[in-house]
């Protein structure tokens, strides 16, 4: 399992995602992405300091990153668990995910088992 974690970390370093910021196209390494979110039918990629627009849908990104540290946490969000600091109970049987930039995201109860399995499988830094 430690070897799987090393291989996964290397893959994340190499995987680039296209994002648009101020009408310019950028290639963002997956390890710099905190999470993806869909708002008003647009998909955004959040890094430590910038928000990029993605042309792909959340479902397409999820499929592309199926063997990475990225996991769906709600109908509208994907989380890079490498950036996860901790999770805390949240009302209505949900979780509050605290990220390394001190931002919090809500994990829907439907996706808690998926998040738990991804963490336990060793797909994280």
Tell me the role of every PLM-derived stretch.
Residues 117-125:
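Short, charged, intrinsically disordered terminal tails
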């Amino acid at each position: 399992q430690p070897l799987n974690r090393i291989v996964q970390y290397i893959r994340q370093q190499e995987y680039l995602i296209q994002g648009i910021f101020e009408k310019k196209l950028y290639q963002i390494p997956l390890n710099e992405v905190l999470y993806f979110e869909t708002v008003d039918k647009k998909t955004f990629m959040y890094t430590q300091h910038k928000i990029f627009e993605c042309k792909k849908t959340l479902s397409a990104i999820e499929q592309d990153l199926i063997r990475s540290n990225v996991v769906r946490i709600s109908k509208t969000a994907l989380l890079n668990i490498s950036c996860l600091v901790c999770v805390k109970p949240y009302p209505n049987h949900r979780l509050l995910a605290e990220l390394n930039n001190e931002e919090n995201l809500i994990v829907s109860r439907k996706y808690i088992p998926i998040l738990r399995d991804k963490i336990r499988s060793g797909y994280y830094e």
